[in-house]
A protein has these predicted regions:
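Conserved functional hotspots at enzyme active or ligand-binding sites that engage polyanionic ligands
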Residues: 1-25, 29-125
Length: 125
């Protein structure tokens, strides 16, 4: 299986500890393609709950895909490393524009400055 940054898969995330996102759920691959080829992968969890409070670490996504909820939120505060054997079914690949949004939210989550500037949300995170 070739895993690429920006791919969305269903994954089995159990067992979990505490408030980690678990169960059979969609995830977005956020690790670079070289790392994906040679090691475990880094993912961000997804929620399809529409009542979830949006935070600067959340990226809403709308898709046109038959076998997947059409709207979901990528939660960049819920990142973790998983073995690729946890990835089950490929769903789709996000657009480069959507991945730039994910990069910004990830930078906020990790407190990373982008291009020498601090994102307005990162100042308060």
């Amino acid at each position: 299986m070739i895993i690429k940054r920006g791919d969305v898969y269903y994954a089995m995330l159990d067992p979990i500890i505490g408030s980690e996102q678990g169960g059979f759920r969609p995830v977005v691959i956020i690790q670079n393609d070289v790392g994906n080829r040679y090691s475990t992968t880094v993912i961000a969890s997804v929620t399809t709950r529409k009542k979830k409070v949006y935070m600067p670490t959340h990226v809403p996504v709308k898709l046109r895909h038959d076998d997947f909820p059409h709207e979901f939120v990528v939660m960049l505060e819920q990142i973790r490393t998983i073995d690729k054997s946890r990835l089950l079914d490929y769903i789709c690949t996000l657009s480069p524009a959507k991945m730039r949004e994910i990069d910004r939210a990830l930078a906020v989550s990790l407190g990373i400055k982008q291009c020498g500037k601090i994102d307005k949300f990162a100042k308060n995170a």
